[in-house]
A protein has these predicted regions:
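C-terminal cap/substrate-recognition subdomain and adjoining C-terminal extension
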Residues: 32-36, 50, 54, 69, ...
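Short, solvent-exposed loop/turn and secondary-structure capping segments
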Residues: 83-86, 91-94, 203-204, 278
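Signal peptide processing junction and immediate N-terminal pro/mature segment
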Residues: 26-31
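Short, solvent-exposed loop/turn elements at domain surfaces
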Residues: 58-59, 81-83, 225-226
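Asp-based phosphoryl-transfer active-site loop
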Residues: 70-84, 276
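A metal-dependent, Asp-based hydrolase signature
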Residues: 86, 91-170, 174
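Mature N-terminal segment immediately following signal peptide/propeptide cleavage
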Residues: 34-76
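N-terminal secretory signal peptides
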Residues: 1-10, 14, 18-25
């Protein structure tokens, strides 16, 4: 049986559509909002991140930051992926040095190189920055930029972490991936600002973190332009350092490549202090955070007494500076993706 409501069919369809829309709205409101940081325990660190995002993205509020000015910076080693027992780039350098020495045994005549080849890390560390620079110069120079990128990519595809026996690109921190995803969704430009080699990190930043290579700022080795006999050209890597993007070098790198102070900055060591200072001493809503490695069971526990990723002054300065210290043990429900 059909009843005549007296309403035109178009009006009836509009009323029906309105009723459906209202029902859908009520259903959506009844469902809890999806947690953008599901790998984080509810605590001060998680709330600080969410609060900063909320304050800076709400229009017509005092702390609103226009999308074009929203910048987030992340250190890499120890902030986005594992840095113990040695920085990944240094493990790469040692593996490459051993491979090179097999072809050219004369490399082992240089004491610091012999120590690295023999796995004598105590002697390598005793060589200080000069010794490390020599190892990096030998293993990272004497080739084109493209060739170096290929070598790094190939190594990352086969190398395994000595403790976890997983590729290094799988030992990234799931909670930090979630933060990066949230910030991108809220209109932040996400940058990696690392003390590691800029080209080394660029070789994997896009597939690993979703960070394009032109959003990576790092320590830079010298290069020169070369025009080849076949008419092609290349950037050739030289055995010298042009810029060190660590400590006070990080704000310099940010100014040179980004051109804006970060709204939010993440680090994990004393080498990130100046980056956090650069971010949080500027007007407006800002946030600086340290990842504190205090979980020996799931990852590593270290801070003041380590040569790799030392966090000493940073812990001392954090309370007065208003920086948030993220406890890996207490704030993170999981460490790595997939487990």
């Amino acid at each position: 049986m059909i009843f005549d409501t007296g309403l035109p069919s178009l009006t009836r369809r509009m009323l029906a559509a309105t009723a459906l829309a209202l029902a859908a709205t009520r259903a959506a409101e009844a469902q809890p909002a999806r947690d953008p940081l599901p790998s984080w325990r509810d605590g001060a660190a998680k709330r600080a991140i969410l609060d900063l995002v909320r304050r800076t993205t709400r229009e017509r509020t005092p702390d609103f930051v226009p999308p074009a000015q929203r910048v987030a910076t992340f250190d890499n080693d120890g902030t986005l992926w594992v840095e113990q027992p040695l920085y990944t780039q240094f493990i790469f350098a040692i593996d490459r040095l051993k491979e090179m020495a097999a072809r050219d045994p004369s490399l082992a005549e240089r004491p610091i190189l012999k120590a690295a080849i023999d796995g004598d890390m105590r002697a390598v560390m005793a060589g200080g920055e000069r010794g490390l620079a020599e190892i990096i110069a030998v293993t990272h120079a004497g080739m084109s930029q493209d060739a170096f990128n290929g070598i790094v990519t190939q190594w990352l595809g086969t190398a395994r972490h000595p403790r976890f026996n997983r590729p290094f690109t799988q030992l990234i921190y799931q909670p930090m991936l979630e933060v990066m995803r949230l910030l991108r969704r809220e209109g932040f430009a996400v940058w990696i600002v690392t003390g590691g080699g800029q080209e080394f990190v660029r070789a994997f930043s896009q597939p690993t973190y979703g960070v394009a290579l032109d959003r990576v700022v790092g320590s830079i080795g010298k290069t020169e332009f070369r025009l080849l006999p076949d008419g092609k050209s290349e950037l050739y890597r030289l055995p010298a350092i042009e810029a060190v993007d660590d400590g006070p070098g990080k704000p310099v790198g940010i100014g040179r490549f980004i051109g804006r102070r970060p709204t939010i900055a993440f680090g994990n060591s004393d080498g990130d202090i100046e980056m956090l200072q650069f971010a949080t001493t500027s007007p407006g809503a800002r946030l600086g955070l340290f990842v504190h490695h205090d979980d020996a069971v799931r990852e590593y526990a270290y801070d003041r007494d380590t040569h790799i990723g030392r966090l000493d002054r940073g812990l001392t300065l954090a309370p007065a500076a208003g920086w948030t210290v993220i406890s890996m043990k207490n704030d993170w429900l999981k460490i790595f993706p997939g487990g």
